[in-house]
Amino acid sequence: MACSAMTKLALVVALCMVVSVPIAQALTCGQVSSNLAPCIAYVRGGGAVPPACCNGIRNINNLAKTTADRQTACNCLKQLSASVPGVNANNAAALPGKCGVNVPYKISPSTNCATVK
């Protein structure tokens, strides 16, 4: 009887541990676009990069924890650059460096996001 009670207790403890583990949320294009909205003026016209833009790039980079997240971010950036009129590809590609953020892919319409690790 004592063995059965200990087994049940162990199962309850294990179940609580599994249930309490936070589930990672996947990065979305909505998060990418809202974080990078302050960058639109810069990628269109150059000049000084707004601090809010750099904060957005840092935030996206920090949110992209997995390969799937980084590939999602890459694809979202490609979609955004195609949908926002007047984007200067050189300005977009220069953003991470100007903000001191190491992004593991080039921000470019020609980037193959499937190869992003």
Curated annotation (Swiss-Prot):
Disulfide bridge partners, by residue number: C29-C76, C39-C53, C54-C99, C74-C113
Keyword S-adenosyl-L-methionine, does the record have it?
no
Record-level Gene Ontology MF annotations: lipid binding
Print the keywords alphabetically: Allergen, Disulfide bond, Lipid-binding, Signal, Transport
Q: Where is the signal peptide?
A: 1-26
SMART domains referenced in this protein's UniProt entry, alphabetically: AAI
**InterPro entries documented for this protein:** Bifun_inhib/LTP/seed_sf, Bifunc_inhib/LTP/seed_store, Plant_nsLTP
GO terms (BP aspect): lipid transport
Q: Does the record's keyword annotation contain Signal?
A: yes
Q: What does this protein do?
A: Plant non-specific lipid-transfer proteins transfer phospholipids as well as galactolipids across membranes. May play a role in wax or cutin deposition in the cell walls of expanding epidermal cells and certain secretory tissues.
What protein family does this chain belong to?
Belongs to the plant LTP family.
UniProt-listed PANTHER family:
NON-SPECIFIC LIPID-TRANSFER PROTEIN 2-RELATED (PTHR33076)
Q: What is this protein called?
A: Non-specific lipid-transfer protein
- Species name for this entry? Prunus avium (Cherry)
